[in-house]
Every structure is written in structure tokens, then in C-alpha cells.
Amino acid sequence: MSARGPAFGLLLLLLCPVQVFSQSCVWYGECGIASGDKRYNCRYSGPPKPLPEDGYDLVQELCPGFFFGNVSLCCDVQQLRTLKDNLQLPLQFLSRCPSCFYNLMNLFCELTCSPRQSQFLNVTATEDYVDPVTNQTKTNVKELEYYVGETFANAMYNACRDVEAPSSNEKALGLLCGREAQACNATNWIEYMFNKDNGQAPFTITPIFSDLPTHGMEPMNNATKGCDESVDEVTGPCSCQDCSIVCGPKPQPPPPPVPWRILGLDAMYVIMWSSYMAFLIVFFGAFFAVWCYRKRYFVSEYTPIDGNIAFSVNSSDKGQAFCCDPLGAAFERGLRRLFAQWGAFCVRHPGCVVFFSLAFIVACSSGLVFIRVTTDPVDLWSAPGSQARREKEYFDTHFGPFFRMEQLIIRATNNQSHIYHPYPAGADVPFGPPLSRDILHQVLDLQTAIENITASYNNETVTLQDICLAPLSPYNKNCTILSVLNYFQNSHSVLDHQVGDFFFVYADYHTHFLYCVRAPASLNDASLLHDPCLGTFGGPVFPWLVLGGYDDQNYNNATALVITFPVNNYYNDTEKLQRAQAWESEFINFVKNYKNPNLTISFMAERSIEDELNRESNSDLFTILISYAIMFLYISIALGHIKSCSRLLVDSKISLGIAGILIVLSSVACSLGIFSYIGVPLTLIVIEVIPFLVLAVGVDNIFILVQTYQRDERLQGETLDQQLGRVLGEVAPSMFLSSFSETVAFFLGGLSVVPAVHTFSLFAGMAVLIDFLLQITCFVSLLGLDIKRQEKNRLDVVCCVQGAEDGAGVQASESCLFRFFKNSYAPLLLKDWMRPIVIAVFVGVLSFSIAVLNKVEIGLDQSLSMPDDSYVMDYFQSLSRYLHAGPPVYFVVEEGHNYTSLKGQNMVCGGLGCNNDSLVQQIFTAAQLDNYTRIGFAPSSWIDDYFDWIKPQSSCCRVYNSTDQFCNASVVDPTCIRCRPLTSEGKQRPQGEDFMRFLPMFLSDNPNPKCGKGGHAAYSSAVNILGNGSGVGATYFMTYHTVLQASADFIDAMQKARLIASNITRTMGLEASSYRVFPYSVFYVFYEQYLTVIDDTIFNLGVSLGAIFLVTVVLMGCELWATVIMCVTIAMILVNMFGVMWLWGISLNAVSLVNLVMSCGISVEFCSHITRAFTLSTKGSRVDRAEEALAHMGSSVFSGITLTKFGGIVVLAFAKSQIFQIFYFRMYLAIVLLGATHGLIFLPVLLSYIGPSINKAKSLATQERYKGTEREQLLNF
């Protein structure tokens, strides 16, 4: 017994390993039909069987680990074919990461073919099956337990969890796990793949996870590969996109700039407040010190505190003139004589002057027949040579212009959500109001009705089919419609499709929707429905483009549906463009009139903004006409000086006022005509702004000229022409000063690269110059004729009628306004106690404006361009409220890159083996920082999808063996073979000739159920193949910006995209190359101006001020200090304009910049006349000279430019257009009020303090000029 015991124990030890590791199967071959085309496996408990040789290729392809010895397996060739077919979906999504796919294949190869199945597979249910061919009874395996090691399951999940699905910009597991990728883990992923309710598994397989033997079973716990490990010597680890371990730590955006604060308060406020307080202390300290000094040493308390002792031309202190004084006096004398002689000539020969003036007007205005009006927004807002324009031109010529867009945003009026209960188990899923089946049917009816809209153009019918974007045409002529209904193939029957029985609904539109939002490119929804998600047009419909109002990525919570009809745009083809516009017009009319109580619709067509702008302009035309009519009426009445009712029609100057207005309008017409002759296009902003500007300048000059004459007395022996010549000699230098300085400033403003400012400056400069020339010629002649009419007592307007003689005649007189300025306003303003208050208030306002200077917003809210009652306003509001994706952005690689070399491919691709700083990888990284970069999604990459498409493991790339022509994956033909062999070399990326040989096939391949990677729909326009097929030209990689609402968002998005592209160009080493990478989005051409608008503003206003300074210092006779004071005052007006812009919510853009340039010119009118009058005054003190200048010129400036413009501006407040209310009413009102207050209040006070000393040479010249006349006594008081 003792000998037999050890022998028996030894036998047990020898038998145990054989029992544990023996090779035994649980099935072999396929038997009965499970469901649809899916079959059960046949129960088999014997040893593995040798695989027939015709299956060797398959086992090498799918399960190379089993290809050894006599290849004895537990599966036959048909099971391998079934395995390959069933793995096509995971192959398309997970093969990007070889380690992930290797582990997955391990799981399924062990399940299907492992020669040791019985160790970890336990059959739990079978049924008999009679083979109809052999009539043999076999046993189907209906249910199975699969024992899987937890270590293996977790390692497989970890290797796959980061893998991207580029076509949907989702994690691939979100498409393969039956739930969101975030909720997916190792166990529920494997459970879902083995659940027959997923539509793919033929029967139920229950996975049991354990690392220890359980119930006598040894779990399958094969070795795995991490995503950062290579599967073999040839294949590298997964890319950074698909494996976060490879990437290292997630990049962090730079911290936002720290606000500039002092003591916790805004630094600008603190600095300007402190500066203002310091100024007040110094200023009032000096004021009271001088006041005390004067009280102590001077008897009279009314002696001016500026210390400028009265100087008279008759005083004994003649003194010596400064070196520049005689030069200035000589220049002034020369201008007086020149204009006096010219004025006398015009009065003596009115017919000749008026005739030649009319001839000049007609000749110049005739150029209007060649006028070209620029209405294209691109030309209006973007300079032809700008970076955005060059990039747009490159994109349009290589890929075609960006499509036109017709879009609807639809909400359900019933806000009730509903709950979906998944079968057989799972958390309840809420669905938003518009995702109820009934609402979807109604929306589909609307969508179909829009598809059937017809329009007429040139007696031809235009349908959506004629103009729409159909990427697969002519194979598939379906229009691209980005709509959630395309998940249901735009079909009522598919929407109603469901699978169930009397008790339960296993799958319906809810199931399909939840799958499609995760896999929009899928051709089989992997549920019991088996409906495709791919749109009928052959491309994916991304959920973020067709759903709105959801939270995070819970698309089922959507509160709005978005339907977009992309329409072809045309590059330089007006005929086709107008056909599209004709259909859009019918589309707008249809949706406007569409009624459905269950739907609320916001919509816009491509032409909507232009249509609404035209409607807005027409609706505000009446308001504008009233504005100008009020100004014209005021001018006509205010020019006359009525002394008595009996002489009302004699002393009125209605005809002269109308003539002056016509001269102003003629100067505008001449300017337009001259530039039309030379081919400079006109913009709408010129038409809107220049009449206002020229009217301001022209009216001011008219009032100064006429009122100076009215206050003048004809000298003894002086004729009318001599008197008017002398008057013109007095005022024309001032008119010339203001007009010429404005002209030079505007012409220099033409150097601006901002199209609106450039065009405005050219037209404005010419109009102001012509207006001045016509005023000193034609208007002077007409004034002489009107005075002759008045002297002959003839009625105004009807000059052939003579009024009654009253003996009064034409006498010099002072108007009420002049007397008010002279006797009340000027003395009050220049009181000793008033002047410091004025200085303190204006410096305070200036300090405030400087403090908010950097807070003025940049940009232009597009909704401001729309009328308040426009349907587009509702669309803009819905756009910002519901949409979750911004405009598409294309990262363009210009022609020149070598895609056929491995190095060139690694620079751009994002998959296996690609550089960690490749183009696609950098955009992917940017999308992870979407709040900072404003890149919302990973890019669609044609080159990565091409590499997946051409893999020999895939069924996508095949050619006919006999002809070497492309064979689509849907074709069943034994002569179709793989494009590349299933060898180590064949599995590598194609290079050189291979790359170019198969690329056209990829770009022409339409997606189908057997291959969803065909690139025709997605990439046919993204890749330019050179004419001879030798290489790849320009290409693009598309993604989307995040939702952009405010102008600041658009500007920042463009800046960040350019920064990314610049970094890509640098990392690719293309700085010295002939090509580069640049981003393009349709809005860049409109928002690029804002990148430099601050610099443009400084440049334009600086050039204008510089020009005004130079011209003024020359024309004012080298009065340098007076010029400095005038320019400082104008600069204060401009700075205060920014303060008003901040207070009134006016942003800085091309429109407001044009207004600022214009305000610079108009400010000259408010300041130059008074400054020049101050320098010419011969009164003793600065206070007296300021008072005289304000009395004589201030009244004309106030009655001319101020009251004229104020009356016209107030009417603009009633305009319907928001852009008129904000950029014209508000800014024009600010220009006039700030100009008037600075010119008529601040400037005289400033001159009274620090104005230049009297020009002694000019005062002596004045004495000589009036010696012996009645005016001599006026100079000596």
C-alpha cells in the first residue's frame, strides 16, 4: 500500500496540468439563424480542428497569434469571415490606435477561435437545429458565459478610452459603448458589445470579470499592450490624440492679464482723478495768489488778472515786433489784397463767374454717369491688400467661395419635455420639447415644403435642387440639408420605424437619435433598427450643428432644432448668383407667411441682411430728407436780417440761402463725379456722411461772409464791389484757413488702409475744396447780385417785383444774436470768477474722457444694422441663445507641401506615428482649451481618414485585378482585390507614387455600409490634386469655432486662430518656405479691421491734427502758439468724443472712425475762426481780444454751423435704424455740442489766459489801413 500511494499521487500530478491546460472547444462552425442575417455557432466539445488553407490569410489578418503549427482552432473559415464583418465598425474607429485594436482583437479572437475555449467559455443554453441541406440535427449555442480577467478588461479599456473618432469629433467609445464616453468603463463596454440587444451580437454572451479562477473556469487574461506601447517592431505607439499618456500633462492656457489696479480701483480712474485734483490745487492756488497780489498792489479790482497790461496802437509803448511778426503781417496783408481783388472782380462780373462756375459743376458732375457704388460688404470693410482679403482670395480660387446659408431655428411652443425609458434597462433619458415625434413630423413637413419652393428668374424656374450644395453629385443629387431629420433620412416612415412586440418597444426613434448624435457618420445604427445615420446627401450631420439649447453634450435636452440649407456660392458668376438670390427671396416670403401654432421659427437667408439694410435705408430716407429740409429752411431764413415787417420780403435772403445750399450740394456732386471719372468706387457711407460734413463747413462760411457784410458799413466813396471785396479780404483768409486745413487733413486721411476711411477722406477732401472755391467765386457773385436786388428794393425770390419805397435802404446793422454775444454772453463768460470755473469743468471732463479712453468697446454689433422690427433681429437673438457651434474655420496648407514623404505626412497628420506637434495635433490641443482658443472641436483630417481607408485590413480600398481601376466596397466581385497587400510593408502608410495613386480613389469614393470612410462627400473639395496628378496642392483641415456672440468674441477667435496657424507654420519649419499655414473663416474679412483699429484711429486722427497744425501755422502768419492752442482744443474735442462714445455705448469701428475724422474737420470750423480773430484783434488785453473775437466770430459760428446742424440732427433721433440712431444721431449730436462748447466757451477762456501776445506788426498795419476812416476811433478805446 505504501508503494502504491506515491505512485497514485504522481499520476495525479501528471494528469492535473493536462486537465487544466487541455485544448478543447465549445463550438465550431455556424448553424441556425439567430436574427436577420446573424447566425448561431454550432455546439462542439471536441479538440480544435486544423484550419483549411483558404483561411490562412484571414487568421493572419485577424488573429496572427494563432498562426502557428497546423493552425488548429475552434472556428472554421466562415466564422473568421463573420468575425471580420462584425469587426468592421470597431476597425474603422479603433484601428487608429494599434494597441487598442490589438487588445480588442485579442478579446474576440479568444472568444471565436481559441483552441482552449473550454477554459473560459461556459455554454449555458442551447437548442436543436435541423440543417436544411444535410437534414442533420445540430445544436445551436444560444447563451454563453465568457470569463474575462479584470486586469485584461481594464487594460483594454485604458488603451482605448482616449481614441478619437475624427468624423464626429467624439471619443470612439461613445459610439461603441451604448452610452456617453464619460459614462463608459471596462465592464459596461464589454457587456454592451456582447449584448444581443445592441443589434450586432447574434446571441447573448454574459461576461464574468475576475482575475481568479471561478466556478472551475480560468478567466481569459492574455497579455495586453498599453496605448503608449508598440504592438510590434514596425508599428509605433498610439498618437497623442488617441493616448493621453503620450501627450504628457494637459496644456494650460496662460492666465488672463491682471487688471491694472491701484488700491483695488481701476488705475486709469485713480491716475486721472489724482491728476485732476492736483491740477485744481495748482490752478486755484495760482488764481488766488494772483488775486491777492492784485488786491494789494492795484487799486482797481477789475484789472485783468492775466497781467497783460492794456496795449493800444496809440500808446507811447510802440515796442519792437518779433522776428516772425512782420512776416505774418505781410502774409496776412497779401491774403487780404488777393481776396479783396478777387471778390471785387466776382461782384463786377457776376454773369461770367456764375457761367464758368456752372460749367465747372456740369463738367465735374457729368462723371456721375460712370459712378460705381460698392455694396459688397467685403469691399466696404476690408482693404484689398489686407491679409484677410489675400487669404480669402486664395481660399476662393482653390476651394471655391464659402457657401450661402439659409437657416431656420425652430422651437416648440409647448415647453414640456418627455422621458424615454430604454429597453431592457438603463437610466431614463429626458428629451427636449422639439424632439417629440409629433413635432419632428411637423418640422419634416416644413422642411419638405421648403425643398419644394420654386422661384422664377429670366422666365426660368429655379428650385433648391438647381442651386443647393450636393457634394456627391452626379452620383447622388440629394441636397445637403443639415437637419436632425437627416438622421431619419428625411423620411416620415423612418421616423416612425420601431421594433417591438405586444408588450415592449425595443427600439424606436429615441434609440436611433441617441446613437446618431454619437456616430453621425454611421451607416448602421447598431441597434435593432439598423437605420443609417449618414445624411441622404452622403455626409455626416453633426449634432452641434442641428441642435440647440442643450447643456454640455446632452443633445437629448435640446430646446431648439436648427435646419441649414447650404447653397452654392459662385466666384465671379453673377448669373448663377442671381438665380440663388431669386430662390432665397421666395424662401423668405414662404417662411414669413408660414403658420404653425406648435412651432416658433426664427430664420435668415444669405440675402436677408442686404434686404433689410435696403428696407431700412428706404424707411429712413424720409427722416433724412426732413433733417436736411429743416437745415435748408433754417439757412434760408436765418441769413436774412429783417429790420421791419414792411421790408420782410426785401431783406430776406431765401434765394441766396438756397443758392448757398445748392453750391454745397454741387460741391458734393463734383467730388463724386471727379472720382467717378478716375474709377474710384463710391460707398454708401460717403453718401450718408459727406453732405453733413460739407454742409457744416459750407454753411459756416456762408454765415460768416453774409453776416460780416451785414455788420459792415460802406466807406465813403466805396462802391459795392469794393466793399464786398474788402469784406471778402477780411473773412476769406479765415475761410481759406479752415477749408484748406480740412482739405489737407482729409486728403492725408486717404492714406488709411481702412476702406471706409480711405474713400471718405478722398471724397470729403475734394468736396470741401470745391465748396470753398465755389463760395469765393459763384456765391460772392450771387451775394453781390442779391445786395443789388436789395438796394433796388426788389422782393426776394420774385426779384422782378419791386417793393414799396420806405426810405430805409440797406444799412449796416447788428443782429440780435450778435448783440447778445457782444453785450451779454462774451462779457459774462470772460468774467474773472467765471473763467476758472470754465477751465475746471472742461479739464474735469477731459480727465474723465482720458480715464475711459481704453474702455470704449471695439467692433460693431451686427444687430445694430437691422431695423427694430426686422425678422433678422429675432434670428440674431435665437442665434446667441441656442446655437452651440460657431462658424467653421479652415486651416489651409498652401500649395508646396510634400504629402508623399513620411516626414511631410508626420508634419500634418494626427494619428499613429505623427509628430506630437503636427498640424492636426496642435488644432486638437487647441480644441481642448476651447474657452481660451475658441476652437470648439478637433479638426476633420482628410489625411488620417485616407490612411484608415487605405489600410489592407479595411474593405474600403480595392481595385479590379484586371484593370487596376477602383472597386467600391459595396461591389461584390471576386476580381476585386486589396489595394495594398496584407504584409508588414502593406500595412505601412502609402508613400511616393502609392500615395498619389490611391488618393483620387479615396476622394471619389462614396460612403456605403461596408465602408464609411469614403472621402467624396467630406473631402472632395478639401484637397487640390495638381493637374498632372504628380502631387497634392493646397488642402485644408476644417473645424469650428466656439459660439461667438459679441464683436470681442469674433476678434479674439480670429487672433487665436492666426496664432495657432503661425505656430504650426513655425513648428513645420516653413518660415523660409514659399508656402505657409493660415486660418480662414468667412467672418475674418469683416473683423480684421478691428485688430488694427486702435492704430488706425491714432494714425488717422494724428495725421489730421498734424495737417491742421501745419496748414494753420502757415496760413495764420506763423502764429505758432495760437495754432498750438487751437490744435489742443481740437484734440480735447476728440478725446471727449471717446468719453461720449463710452457713456453712450458707441463702439469703435470703421463707421465711428469716419465720424471721428469728420469731427476733426468740423472742429476746425468751431475753433479756427475765433482763434484767427483773436490773433488779429488789436485790443489791449487778452481778455479784451478774446471778448472781441467771441463777439464777432462766435455769433456767426453759433448761428451758422451750430444751430443749422443741431436742427437737422435732432430729427435723426426718430430714425428707425439703430445704426442711424447710434452712429449718426448720437455721434453727430456729440460732435456739434462738443465743438460748440469748446469753440464758444473753452477756447475763448483759454485764449484769455494763455493766448499769444498781440502781433504788433499786424496792429500797426491795421492802424494804417483804417487811418482817416470812421473806424479809426474804434481801434482806440
From Swiss-Prot:
Carbohydrate-modified residues: 70, 122, 135, 185, 222, 415, 452, 459, 478, 898, 916, 931, 961, 968, 1028, 1063
Bilayer disposition of the protein: Multi-pass membrane protein
Example of a GO biological process term: lysosomal transport
Annotated site, Important for cholesterol binding, chain positions: F108
PTM comment: N-glycosylated.
Residues in compartment: Lumenal: 23-269, 372-621, 675-677, 756-759, 854-1097, 1145, 1216-1226
Cytoplasmic side: 291-350, 643-653, 699-734, 781-832, 1119-1123, 1167-1194, 1248-1277
Residue span, SSD domain: 620-785
Source species, domain of life: Eukaryota
UniProt short sequence motif Di-leucine motif, positions renumbered to this chain: 1274-1277
GO molecular function: cholesterol binding; lipid transporter activity
Family matches, as InterPro entries: HMGCR/SNAP/NPC1-like_SSD, NPC1-like, NPC1_MLD, NPC1_N, SSD
Similarity field: Belongs to the patched family.
Function: Intracellular cholesterol transporter which acts in concert with NPC2 and plays an important role in the egress of cholesterol from the endosomal/lysosomal compartment. Unesterified cholesterol that has been released from LDLs in the lumen of the late endosomes/lysosomes is transferred by NPC2 to the cholesterol-binding pocket in the N-terminal domain of NPC1. Cholesterol binds to NPC1 with the hydroxyl group buried in the binding pocket. Binds oxysterol with higher affinity than cholesterol.
Assembly with partners or alone: Interacts (via the second lumenal domain) with NPC2. Interacts with TMEM97; the interaction may decrease NPC1 availability to the cell. Interacts with TIM1. Interacts with SLC38A9; this interaction inhibits cholesterol-mediated mTORC1 activation via its sterol transport activity.
Name by which UniProt lists this protein: NPC intracellular cholesterol transporter 1
Species: Sus scrofa (Pig)
Classification of source organism: Eukaryota, Metazoa, Chordata, Craniata, Vertebrata
